[in-house]
Amino acid sequence: MSKRTYQPNNRRRAKTHGFRVRMRTRAGRAIIAARRRKGRRELTA
């Protein structure tokens, strides 16, 4: 039997989906802009 694929880890989560990572690329900034437009309470992880 194989283990579950999702092993939660806050540091890894922030390093891959965090605000600073998103701001690094044009596409990432677009994601944040879209979430702001939509009115998301949380923009990033």
UniProtKB/Swiss-Prot annotation:
The keyword Ribonucleoprotein applies. The keyword Transferase does not apply. One of its GO terms (cellular component) is ribosome. GO terms for molecular function: structural constituent of ribosome. It holds the Pfam family Ribosomal_L34. Disulfide bonds: none annotated. Belongs to the bacterial ribosomal protein bL34 family. Signal peptide: none annotated. GO terms for biological process: translation. PROSITE patterns: RIBOSOMAL_L34 (PS00784). Keywords: Ribonucleoprotein, Ribosomal protein. InterPro entries: Ribosomal_bL34 (IPR000271), Ribosomal_bL34_CS (IPR020939). This is Large ribosomal subunit protein bL34.
